[in-house]
């Protein structure tokens, strides 16, 4: 972390799928949650922007997710990117994904618990409304362009195996 300088253009997005037990089970390694928490605290202490990336799976009570959101806000992260775990064929475990009705109900229950709280999400209100089942959208390459070491991530990459484009122009032109 000492190799970087805080900037409004640099955000550390830390993967945390819920509370200690749930996250460590999700990544199949005990102790990862505590390491993530210490990294988050260190980065915030040094003045960096920090967000959390959280995926929700089956059998997660909204109350537990609400406690996680409270904890994330207490840590001082800028926001949480939250989404349901979408089913995809190559996943090593197939029985953990939320069905459409389960996903809608979980997010409706969660948002109800969040009324009056100061939870900060790293997504638009349109997307959050979609999670609660109040909107439908199609996948688009411009909806949430993401670039990582593999290239430009195509939308619905998990659902249809689209993968990545090597350039932004390729992402826009090749995505159907």
Label every model-predicted segment.
Residues 2-4:
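Short amphipathic alpha-helix with an adjacent loop that forms part of the alpha/beta core around
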Residues 6-141, 149-150, 154, 159, ...:
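Radical SAM enzyme [4Fe-4S]-AdoMet core and its adjacent flexible, acidic
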Residues 164-176:
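Short, solvent-exposed cationic patches
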């Amino acid at each position: 972390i000492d190799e970087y300088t805080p900037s409004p253009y640099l955000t550390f997005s830390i993967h945390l799928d819920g509370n200690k037990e749930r996250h460590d089970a999700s990544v199949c390694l005990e102790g990862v949650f505590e390491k993530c928490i210490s990294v988050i605290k260190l980065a915030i202490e040094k003045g960096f922007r920090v967000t959390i990336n959280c995926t929700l799976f089956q059998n997660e009570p909204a109350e537990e997710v609400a406690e996680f959101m409270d904890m994330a806000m207490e840590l001082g992260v800028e926001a949480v990117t939250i989404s349901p775990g979408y089913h995809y064929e190559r996943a090593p475990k197939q029985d953990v994904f939320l069905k459409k009705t389960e996903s809608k109900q979980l997010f409706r229950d969660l948002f109800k618990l969040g009324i009056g709280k100061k939870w900060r999400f790293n997504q638009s209100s349109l997307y959050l409304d979609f999670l609660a089942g109040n909107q439908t959208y199609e996948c688009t390459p411009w909806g949430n362009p993401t670039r990582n070491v593999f290239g430009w991530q195509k939308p619905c990459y998990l659902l249809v195996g689209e993968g990545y484009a090597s350039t932004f122009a390729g992402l826009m032109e090749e995505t159907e």
